[in-house]
């Protein structure tokens, strides 16, 4: 299993990138957002990968963070959602947008992804709504693994230091949401209720304290 690639970017296609790792070129399929965040040609890039294995096909899919990769794996666990549909959802909504839409049961947002019809969007929401909180809670821990992801390339110690690896879009948001979700669960709120409150609060709050306060207001008993 290939879980991560670190190499030099040879080129970017419409839906994939070619990464040179020690003289071997790997074709890695990525979402539009991931492709847009990659560095310039010739610079060092690191992607977390998921390998799709079929009888007549081997395909690598790349992600800027382990958190994004986990969401891809969760999405593809839904019947009818292949890697292409998952990439479309993540490319259209981003990780945070997809998490928010699923947690709040917003099938319309999921349907905005190219190739995702209303029935499939509804199935995604229904099947993943209860599973989303667990992945959301992993966000902060997984994103910590992004630190220092670009190591020195073998045999290139004398080369100029590579440009810093681009971070995943909205990484601080996923970290804050994971921390807020964990805090609410520690206060006794159920995973599903806590995740819905955090997802709603994220529309107007960004850092952890703000998210917790806003979520608690949403969870407070209505008079």
Curated annotation (Swiss-Prot):
Q: Which residues lie within the region annotated Disordered?
A: 148-177
Q: Which keywords does this Swiss-Prot/TrEMBL entry list?
A: Cytoplasm, DNA damage, DNA recombination, DNA repair, DNA-binding
Stretches the record annotates as Domain II: 65-143
Q: Where in the cell is it found?
A: Cytoplasm
What Gene3D superfamilies does this protein map onto? 5' to 3' exonuclease, C-terminal subdomain, DNA helicase RuvA subunit, C-terminal domain, Nucleic acid-binding proteins
* Region annotated Flexible linker, chain positions: 144-171
Output the Gene Ontology cellular-component terms: cytoplasm; Holliday junction helicase complex; Holliday junction resolvase complex
Q: Does the keyword Cell cycle apply?
A: no
> Does the entry feature the keyword Cell inner membrane, yes or no?
no
A molecular function (GO) held by this record is: four-way junction DNA binding
Region of interest: Domain III? 172-223
Q: Residues annotated as region Domain I?
A: 1-64
Q: Name one GO biological process term.
A: DNA recombination
By its UniProt entry, which HAMAP family does this protein fall under?
Answer: DNA_HJ_migration_RuvA
- How does the entry describe the domains? Has three domains with a flexible linker between the domains II and III and assumes an 'L' shape. Domain III is highly mobile and contacts RuvB.
Described function: The RuvA-RuvB-RuvC complex processes Holliday junction (HJ) DNA during genetic recombination and DNA repair, while the RuvA-RuvB complex plays an important role in the rescue of blocked DNA replication forks via replication fork reversal (RFR). RuvA specifically binds to HJ cruciform DNA, conferring on it an open structure. The RuvB hexamer acts as an ATP-dependent pump, pulling dsDNA into and through the RuvAB complex. HJ branch migration allows RuvC to scan DNA until it finds its consensus sequence, where it cleaves and resolves the cruciform DNA.
Subunit composition?
Homotetramer. Forms an RuvA(8)-RuvB(12)-Holliday junction (HJ) complex. HJ DNA is sandwiched between 2 RuvA tetramers; dsDNA enters through RuvA and exits via RuvB. An RuvB hexamer assembles on each DNA strand where it exits the tetramer. Each RuvB hexamer is contacted by two RuvA subunits (via domain III) on 2 adjacent RuvB subunits; this complex drives branch migration. In the full resolvosome a probable DNA-RuvA(4)-RuvB(12)-RuvC(2) complex forms which resolves the HJ.
Family according to the record = Belongs to the RuvA family.
Q: What is this protein called?
A: Holliday junction branch migration complex subunit RuvA
Q: Which organism is it from?
A: Jannaschia sp. (strain CCS1)
């Amino acid at each position: 299993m290939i879980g991560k690639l670190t190499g030099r970017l040879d080129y970017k296609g419409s839906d994939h990138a070619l990464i040179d790792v020690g003289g071997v070129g790997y074709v890695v399929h990525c979402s539009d957002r991931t492709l847009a965040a990659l560095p310039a040609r010739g610079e060092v890039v690191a992607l977390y990968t998921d390998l799709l294995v079929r009888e007549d096909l081997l395909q690598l899919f790349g992600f800027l963070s382990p958190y994004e990769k986990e969401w891809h794996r969760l999405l593809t666990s839904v019947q009818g959602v292949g890697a292409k549909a998952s990439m479309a959802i993540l490319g259209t909504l981003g990780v945070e947008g997809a998490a928010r839409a699923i947690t709040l049961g917003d099938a319309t947002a999921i349907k905005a992804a190219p190739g995702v019809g209303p029935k499939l969007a509804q199935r995604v929401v229904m099947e993943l709504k209860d599973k989303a909180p667990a992945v959301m809670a992993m966000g902060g821990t997984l994103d910590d693994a992004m630190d220092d992801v670009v190591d020195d390339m073998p045999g290139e110690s004398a080369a100029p230091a590579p440009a810093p690896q681009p971070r995943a879009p909205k990484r601080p948001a996923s970290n804050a949401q994971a921390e807020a979700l964990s805090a609410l669960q520690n206060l006794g709120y159920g995973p599903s209720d806590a995740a819905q409150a955090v997802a709603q609060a994220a529309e107007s709050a960004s850092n952890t304290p703000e998210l917790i306060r806003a979520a608690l207001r949403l969870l407070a008993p209505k008079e």
